[in-house]
Curated annotation (Swiss-Prot):
Entry's family note: Belongs to the cytochrome c oxidase VIIc family.
Pathway: Energy metabolism; oxidative phosphorylation
Presence of keyword Acetylation: yes
Source organism of the structure: Saimiri sciureus
Modified residues (N6-succinyllysine): K25
Membrane topology: Single-pass membrane protein
Name used for this protein in its record: Cytochrome c oxidase subunit 7C, mitochondrial
Main location: mitochondrion
InterPro entries, per database record: COX7C/Cox8 (IPR004202), COX7C/Cox8_sf (IPR036636)
Mitochondrial intermembrane side: 61-63
N6-acetyllysine, modified sites: K25
Length: 63
């Protein structure tokens, strides 16, 4: 009896957990607006590129 109720709960939980399908729907950010996506990617990759230079500048200016 307990096993049946657990099985019923898990199958109903799986049925309720449907998500949207299609290109870009499984990403943690939206790809619908290409200009916002471009700005976010430039910010992300630009900050990763600039970090070593900013650290170097900080170390050189330190007294």
């Amino acid at each position: 009896m307990l096993g049946q109720s657990i099985r019923r709960f898990t199958t109903s939980a799986v049925r309720r957990s449907h998500y949207e399908e299609g290109p870009g729907k499984n990403l943690p950010f939206s790809v619908e607006n290409k200009w916002r996506l471009l700005a976010m990617m430039c910010l992300y990759f630009g900050s990763a590129f600039a970090t070593p230079f900013l650290i170097l500048r900080h170390q050189l200016l330190k007294k």
